[in-house]
């Protein structure tokens, strides 16, 4: 599991930052990539990475402001041109389907794959499979805005090889089935339950993504015990009043969430163009006074998300 920042600017692009997009790479787990918001020129940013558009199977849209969605029509069109694109699901607030369909219709663009739309209305579970579950909750912005919590389900414990050796289980398919927790039958007819040969389950990883919002209790609920929290940081700590007025957060707001909710690593994104160079690094410096595992995200930064412990 890896996370890559394709755009980290707030409102409009700057010389060093494109507008919002995050890629959650689940290649080892699902052979898929999920995008969170698709700002203008996202497909240009993707060209600078190893991401293949056909691997993108799910897109999660936090809200419908232009700097978070204007890249959708172009990306969807290019994904079609490149072929081999399977079904795609877009999760987002009311209006996202209308925006996409209108853009495609007016430009007479036809995509070669089905697009499913899931409208975000209430807090709770929006996706689940055997490996992951995704939850959403309403944030506090000028338009309906949602945060996301991606939860990897617990992983099976390690196979207890010393115990396996006592039963002379041969290498091969039987050992693999035992590791998967299944019941196997040995050549002498003895049955072994794989669950008896596994160590304790290991908790999966949790990634929380918070875009445009004022501080609100829902952020904490989404961020609880997250291995990675990505949080908007439009303003520095001295601009609390301005952040409140414009329905945004400061770097200190993000750091407090991370500190108070047992977060592993905090990444600051959605950075105003006023914070370049030393001013940008100051955001990170100030946030680290509250939560030391804080990182200022830059475009194309790529981080592996490892299992805790």
UniProtKB/Swiss-Prot annotation:
Q: Which UniProt keywords apply?
A: Endonuclease, Hydrolase, Metal-binding, Nuclease, tRNA processing, Zinc
Q: Which residues bind Zn(2+) 2?
A: 67-68, 212, 270
**What superkingdom heads the lineage?**
Bacteria
EC code: 3.1.26.11
Give the enzyme's main class according to its UniProt record, as a single word.
hydrolase
Which cysteines share a disulfide bond? none
Positions of Zn(2+) 1 binding: 63, 65, 141, 212
Q: Extract the GO molecular function terms from the UniProt entry.
A: 3'-tRNA processing endoribonuclease activity; zinc ion binding
Q: How many cofactors are bound and how? A: Binds 2 Zn(2+) ions.
Catalytic function, reaction form: Endonucleolytic cleavage of RNA, removing extra 3' nucleotides from tRNA precursor, generating 3' termini of tRNAs. A 3'-hydroxy group is left at the tRNA terminus and a 5'-phosphoryl group is left at the trailer molecule
UniProt KW Transmembrane helix keyword:
no
Query: Is-annotated flag, keyword Ligase?
Result: no
Q: Which residues form the active site?
A: 67
Annotated family: Belongs to the RNase Z family.
| Annotated function | Zinc phosphodiesterase, which displays some tRNA 3'-processing endonuclease activity. Probably involved in tRNA maturation, by removing a 3'-trailer from precursor tRNA.
Q: How is the subunit organization of this protein annotated in UniProt?
A: Homodimer.
- What is the protein name for this chain? Ribonuclease Z
């Amino acid at each position: 599991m890896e996370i890559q920042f394709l755009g980290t600017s707030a409102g409009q692009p700057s010389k060093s930052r494109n507008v919002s997009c995050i890629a959650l790479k689940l290649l080892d787990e699902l052979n898929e990539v999920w995008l969170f918001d698709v700002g203008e020129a996202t497909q240009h940013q993707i060209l600078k990475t190893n991401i293949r558009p056909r691997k993108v199977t799910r897109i999660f849209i936090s809200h419908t402001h232009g700097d978070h969605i204007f890249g959708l029509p172009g990306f969807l069109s290019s994904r079609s041109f490149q072929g081999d694109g399977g079904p795609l699901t877009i999760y987002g607030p009311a209006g996202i389907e209308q925006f996409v369909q209108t853009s495609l219709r007016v430009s007479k663009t036809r995509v070669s794959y089905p697009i499913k739309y899931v409208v975000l209305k209430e807090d709770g579970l929006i996706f689940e499979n055997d490996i992951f579950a995704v939850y959403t909750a309403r944030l506090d912005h000028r338009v309906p805005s949602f945060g996301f919590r991606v939860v990897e389900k617990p992983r099976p414990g390690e196979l207890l090889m010393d115990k396996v050796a006592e039963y002379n289980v041969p290498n091969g398919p039987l050992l693999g089935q035992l590791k998967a927790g299944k019941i196997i039958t040995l050549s002498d007819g003895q049955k072994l339950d794989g669950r008896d040969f596994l160590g304790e389950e290991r908790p999966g990883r949790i990634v929380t993504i918070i875009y445009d919002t004022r501080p609100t209790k829902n952020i904490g609920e989404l961020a609880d015990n997250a291995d990675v929290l990505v949080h908007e940081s439009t303003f520095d700590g001295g601009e609390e009043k301005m952040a409140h007025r414009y329905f945004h957060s400061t770097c200190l707001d993000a750091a407090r969430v991370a500190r108070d909710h047992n977060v592993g690593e905090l990444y600051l994104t959605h950075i105003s163009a006023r914070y370049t160079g030393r001013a940008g690094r100051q955001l990170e410096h100030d946030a680290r006074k509250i939560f030391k595992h804080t990182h200022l995200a830059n475009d194309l930064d790529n981080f592996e998300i490892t299992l805790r412990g």
